[in-house]
Curated annotation (Swiss-Prot):
This is S-adenosylmethionine synthase 1. It catalyses: L-methionine + ATP + H2O = S-adenosyl-L-methionine + phosphate + diphosphate. Catalyzes the formation of S-adenosylmethionine from methionine and ATP. The reaction comprises two steps that are both catalyzed by the same enzyme: formation of S-adenosylmethionine (AdoMet) and triphosphate, and subsequent hydrolysis of the triphosphate. NCBIfam families: metK. InterPro entries: ADOMET_SYNTHASE_CS, S-AdoMet_synt_C, S-AdoMet_synt_central, S-AdoMet_synt_N, S-AdoMet_synthetase, S-AdoMet_synthetase_sfam. The lineage of its organism: Eukaryota, Viridiplantae, Streptophyta, Embryophyta, Tracheophyta. Belongs to the AdoMet synthase family. K(+) binds at E43. The gene is METK1. It is an enzyme of class 2 (transferase). Binds 2 divalent ions per subunit. The metal ions interact primarily with the substrate. Can utilize magnesium, manganese or cobalt (in vitro). Its EC number is 2.5.1.6. ATP binds at H15, D167, G168, K169, S235, G236, R237, F238, D246, R252, K253, A269, K273, K277. One of its GO terms (cellular component) is cytosol.
Length: 393
């Protein structure tokens, strides 16, 4: 049996880039909660003792940007300079302007257009992907890397591993076999975890705790054997972390946010963007389309692409590829996708309820992936029953 290795990485919520994603989405939540028509393009950057929020926001909401920044940093665990950032004493800069009137008239006619007339907020192309190798219909390498990152945070916050600090990265290499286009995971080849830690803990304690409290609960035993390679804090020391260790920026972790290197990516980031930005809403609807195709049994693996022009409601193109796993030809599946999914931005907002913010809805998406999550707020993960004319035998 011929096999190959494929690797996906993740970072947890204390990574500086992910901190920025979460702040940008916390701002989006606050705007949408008070004004569902808010137009938000919110970027964040951070370095030692500094967080800056900047971008274009047009909203009726009254938003305390500085409070959102400090609350988000505090909730992640950035409560002192020792751990990489002090939420209560760091410098917070805010540079927010209104959305360009040129963009506003072209996209939503200054809020005069009906939902089906609303144009895409920008040009671009987005991809959705699904595979039957896990219950989430997501790639196993990505699922495991993401869950390891989430588990690192869990054992830090619940006190199981008190030596942990907020910043951390994970990476999982899986050995796969290609079954006529479908991906079959054979075993986990390599597990890599680099996590920030305090001054007192030894490397042996780190390795022992990570194996016992992080890896064991996350990776099913059937995927591990005596040949599995573990790299646990291979650099030997990771005390300085968070924004003190590295600068952070919104939109720098787009592969971690999506499919871990599987499928494809159009390049547009998600966090801090309202649903008229098709970078986000377009990627969400094509994930729902790909997932629904695989869940319905029409294919074992599927990628869907959609593309847009600024100000134009209808997509320019829709593409489907099932990697040879389709039960019917791809052109038939493409027809089914077009008949069952409305790719116009205004209609995607309605059908996926994307104007509803608050309650940390979009903040939740900004760490541990936007897809494959079992949470009612992730409306794009709901499998849509597909209506189509089955060919007569």
């Amino acid at each position: 049996m011929e096999t190959f290795l494929f690797t996906s990485e993740s970072v947890n919520e204390g990574h500086p880039d992910k901190l920025c994603d979460q702040i940008s989405d916390a701002v989006l939540d606050a705007c949408l909660e008070q004004d569902p028509e808010s137009k938000v393009a919110c970027e964040t950057c951070t370095k030692t003792n500094l967080v800056m929020v900047f971008g274009e926001i047009t909203t009726k909401a009254i938003v305390d940007y500085e409070k959102i920044v400090r609350d988000t940093c505090r909730n992640i665990g950035f409560v002192s300079d020792d751990v990489g950032l002090d939420a209560d004493n760091c410098k917070v800069l805010v540079y927010i302007e209104q959305q360009s009137p040129d963009i506003a008239q072209g996209v939503h006619g200054h809020l005069t257009k009906r939902p089906e007339e609303i144009g895409a907020g920008d040009q671009g192309h987005m991809f959705g992907y699904a595979t039957d190798e896990t219950p989430e219909l997501m790639p196993l390498s990505h699922v495991l890397a993401t869950k390891l990152g989430a588990r690192l945070t869990e054992v830090r916050k619940n006190g199981t591993c008190p030596w942990l600090r907020p910043d951390g990265k994970t990476q999982v290499t899986v050995e796969y076999c290609n079954d006529n286009g479908a991906m079959i995971p054979i075993k986990v080849h390599t597990v890599l975890i680099s996590t920030q830690h305090d001054e007192t803990v030894t490397n042996d304690e780190i390795a022992r705790d990570l194996k016992e409290h992080v890896i064991k609960p996350v990776i099913p035993e059937k995927y591990l054997d005596e040949k599995t390679i573990f790299h646990l804090n291979p650099s030997g020391r990771f005390v300085i972390g968070g924004p003190h260790g590295d600068a952070g920026l919104t939109g720098r972790k787009i592969i971690i946010d999506t499919y871990g290197g599987w499928g494809a990516h159009g390049g547009g980031a998600f966090s801090g963007k309202d649903p008229t930005k098709v970078d986000r809403s377009g990627a969400y609807i094509v994930r729902q389309a790909a997932k629904s195709i695989v869940a319905s049994g029409l294919a074992r693996r599927c990628i869907v692409q959609v593309s847009y022009a600024i100000g134009v409601p209808e997509p320019l193109s829709v593409f489907v590829d099932t990697y040879g796993t389709g039960k019917i030809p791809d052109k038939e599946i493409l027809k089914i996708v077009k008949e069952n999914f409305d790719f116009r931005p205004g209609m995607m907002s309605i059908n996926l309820d994307l104007k509803r913010g608050g309650n940390g809805r979009f903040l939740k998406t900004a760490a541990y992936g936007h897809f494959g999550r079992d949470d009612p707020d992730f409306t794009w993960e709901v499998v849509k029953p597909l209506k189509w004319e089955k060919p007569q035998d």
